[in-house]
Amino acid sequence: MNLRPEEISSIIQEQIKRYENKLEVKDVGTVIQVGDAIARIHGLEKCMAGELLEFPGGVYGMALNLEEDNVGCVLLGSDDKIKEGDTVKRTGRIVEVPVGEALLGRVVNSLGQPIDGKGPIQTDKYRDIERVAPGIIARKSVHEPLQTGIKAIDSMIPIGRGQRELIIGDRQTGKTAIAIDTIINQKHSDVICIYVAIGQKKSTVSQIQDTLEKNGAMEYTIIVASTASELAPLQYIAPYAGCAMGEEFMENGKHVLIIYDDLSKHAVAYRAMSLLLRRPPGREAYPGDVFYLHSRLLERAAKLSDERGGGSLTALPLIETQAGDVSAYIPTNVISITDGQIFLESELFYSGVRPAVNPGISVSRVGGNAQIKAMKKVAGTLRLELAQYRELAAFAQFGSELDKETQARLAQGERIIEMLKQPQFKPMPVEEQVMMIYAITNKYLTDIEVVEIGPFESQFISYMVGHHAEVGQAIRDNGVLDQASETTLKEAIEAFKKQFKAERE
């Protein structure tokens, strides 16, 4: 093929016209120090706070300290293959996690990656883990109940959808048990549950997954696990990741329950990270912003207004105390952020009162508005009667001469305490709770022995379901105990009591 010189020049001119000078500018930095899941990077002058940074070998980090001549970054993976002099690239993104229906029934890590061996999660939706909490206009007051299925809580410390209720107590007092029971109790409601395990043993998380699967609760639950063997930065982001997953459902008009188990370990992970980043320590060596650490997380729990879809995110944070000391730094912080707290006591737990809730110092600041009318009606005097019982029981130890009224109050208190006991993983439907509490508060069980209260309850509920199912149905459907239902309930209690006593003789 022969080309004339003028043709060659026209081809070259055409090529020059088509040439695009594409210059790709990348902001890169250099690792100057690495160790303990912390890296210091020189360069990256335009780096954002909380930005995701890419290290060699596919490891990512999060920029937390933006200093004059370097960036302090926490690593979200192993630092084994990262060395001094390595190149670090900016991604321009904040840490994000996958969200949506595909996560239901799965166990994921802090970054939303599956760790249950059930294959990849098919979703194309992602959300930033840090998000500004809904404003005042976007919210609505808490008015719908979130039933835990635990008599002591639903009757005296009611929780509403969109509330933050702290569960606080020493180790081994049944904090996680209350949280798991609450998840199991959502089986017949429309609530999606998220359980965030922070700094727990892998065996414990596996046990919880097994319990939820056995009770058919895993199908509407997501477990976000950042176990004790994981790096502090991964434990730090776990609750925010779980919250982002919950917000996706909340903003689509659904109701979500999220459990943070527990925030004491979360604060410890943040303290370790902050000290390694050379941030100045404050009280108990925690950094100055440890209050903000938890407040920005718990403020994201909300009941959205009808214009925003009316969804809700209810948070149950757990805090572990040391020898019952609730005046320590982290417990007082979280108590002041939440809308109430459920105190669990070791003394009660070891004396056989389980769940070991102390109703005297437990409180729900907004849940009363959410309690169903039937429960409000029957449980109104419960807290007062228990308080009177505790006061009288303390005096009764000293004197044997007690008048009849005092003896009656002590007997009533003993029966209430016995009735509030409940086995683990056996949450009770609210209509059954109402019927049993009605029988106790209206003094129908004064002639039943304290040890017989448990058997009486289980047989009485079976009797009501078999003979008067309409009473439970009415309470469940309307949330009220009307005149007709109350009359039927009174007659049923009297009839069953005769039958129960006859069988015992």
Swiss-Prot record:
Protein family (similarity comment): Belongs to the ATPase alpha/beta chains family.
Classification lineage: Bacteria, Bacillati, Bacillota, Clostridia, Peptostreptococcales
Signal peptide: none
Binding annotation for ATP: G169, D170, R171, Q172, T173, G174, K175, T176
Protein name in the entry: ATP synthase subunit alpha
Gene it is expressed from: atpA
EC number(s) on file: 7.1.2.2
Keywords: ATP synthesis, ATP-binding, Cell membrane, CF(1), Hydrogen ion transport, Ion transport, Membrane, Nucleotide-binding, Translocase, Transport
Location(s), subcellular: Cell membrane
InterPro entries the record matches: ATP_synth_asu-like_sf, ATP_synth_asu_C, ATP_synth_asu_C_sf, ATP_synth_F1_a_nt-bd_dom, ATP_synth_F1_asu, ATPase_a/bsu_AS, ATPase_F1/V1/A1_a/bsu_N, ATPase_F1/V1/A1_a/bsu_N_sf
Primary role: Produces ATP from ADP in the presence of a proton gradient across the membrane. The alpha chain is a regulatory subunit.
